[in-house]
Structure formats: structure tokens, C-alpha cells
Amino acid sequence: MYKSKFLIAIMVIALVTMACGINFNLPVTEVKTGPKQTDEISVPIPDTKSTIDLTLSFGAGEIQVQPEAQDVLISGTVSYNVSDFKPIIEASGSQVEIKQGNLEINGIPNFDKTVKNTWDLNLNTGVPLNLNIKAGAYSGKYELGGLSLENLDVTDGAADVDVNFSEPNLSNMVKLSYNTGASNVTLEGLGNANFENMVFKSGAGSYRLSFDGDLKQDGTVSVESGISTVTIVVPEGVPAQVTFEGGLSHVQTYGAWAQSGDSYSMDGTGPKLTIDVKMGAGTLELRNK
């Protein structure tokens, strides 16, 4: 029940922002729903030697993405009961985008739980990708393990999101970037992401960044967060250095962390994580599991 109410609320925020801008004098507009429609998605692999830039532009609703060994770049389904949500596919050279259709409204949309918009997409595991996810207020579940990601860039609004790398990323990832608003975000298996640099920026909310997995190379991580609780998990035995800056925040450590002023470290062997954390207020938790 709570999740349903949360999704309705964030859909309003996202679509007002995307379609109308902020205007408190706008009238309330009923969102017209109809029978549920399901579109089959099948996007061929572009004929190019370049890394494919794949963009998923999603306004509000629910999205699920997972890897799949297949002959096409993307397969899956999109289900919706608002005709304006019909997805649009654009492809040119190495650029591919799937985007939610624009909702045509003249005021503030009045949503209830009958409004549906669900994406379920499978991504090709063997094609090198720069994956860009641009979303509004939504619920998302991304299983990205086993893909060939060279860059990952996620930007979303008020969101409830789980990202997981349950298997190693098959490519070297130059940069992993996640920028979110007031959200609840969990990133698991980051050791499998095979990244060189990671940037995580957030507003108020609750965030968990777990670097479990098979860390293949040194990684540099920058975390900037507002009034929030940020949990960073580094498995015991992985060398790590965390530098913290946050005048109105405090740090709680659990496990094998050693403190020296605003610096926290853990001994280990193999590739090292260097993490810089800046917080406006709240709590930083450092854990081993």
C-alpha cells in the first residue's frame, strides 16, 4: 500500500515537472486512462563499429532492466493505460533512445492508482554500451551484471531504485555516474561494475552503496549528499580509504574500519577503493557487510 501511494505521488511530481513546469495557478486536470496496452519492444543492433550510446528516457511509473543473451540490442515490453505514454524509439548510427511519450495536459495531473506505466526491458550482453538512464519520479530495478558497459550515467528525480551487478561487467567502465533527488537508492555488487571512477550525488533520502563483488582495479569514488543516511559497504579484506567532510553529520563504523581524524581506512590486499564523502547533514555508516 505504501509503495503504491509513493508511486502515485512521485508520478505527479515527475510529470508536472516534465510536461508543465511549476505553475501553482494551473487547474487540476484528470488524467484519462483507457484499456491497458502492451507494446513489444525489439531494437536491432546498429551496424556500427562504435560503442553504442543507449538512452532510456522514462518519466514516471515502474521500470525493470536485465541482461539477456539475444540477437537484438533491446527486447521486452511496455505496458500502459494512458495513450500519451506510448514509447518512442529513435535510432541513428550508434545512437539509440527509447523514450516515454509526452503527456499532453493543461494543468496539474490528478493521478490515482489506476494509472499504469511499466517497462520491462532486456539488454544485449555482448554489445559494448554507454548506458544513459534519464528518469523522473519512479520505481526501478536494474540488474546490470553480465552486460558490457563502458560508461553508466543515471539521472533521476524522486525515486525508489535498486541497481545490482550480480555478475561482473564484461567491459572496463570508465565512469559510473548516479545523480538523484530525494530518493531511496540501493547499489549492490559495485565491485563487479569494474569502474575506474564513480560519482554519486543525491538530495535528501536513504542510500546504500555496496562494493561487494570481484574488484579488478583501483577505484575512485566521490559521494555528495544532502540531508540523508548514506551507507557504504566495503567487504573486509578490500583496502579502502574514506575521507569525510560534513559539519552537521556524524559517522558510524561497523567492522574493521580504523579512524584517524576525518579519515577512515581498512587494510587489505588487491585493488584499492579511495572514497571521498561530502554530506550536508545526516549519518554516514561504514560497514563490511
What are these regions (language model features)?
Residues 1-6:
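Positively charged n-region of N-terminal signal peptides that target proteins for export
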Residues 16-19:
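C-terminal motif of bacterial Sec signal peptides marking the signal peptidase cleavage site
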Residues 21-23:
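Bacterial signal peptide processing site
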Residues 26-99, 114-134, 139-155, 162-168, ...:
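Short linear S-[DN]-x-LW-Φ motif typified by the pepsin-like aspartic protease active-site region
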Residues 39-45, 76-80, 84, 95-112, ...:
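Short, surface-exposed interaction patches in beta-rich subdomains
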Residues 156-158, 180:
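Periodic small-residue-enriched repeat registers in elongated scaffold domains
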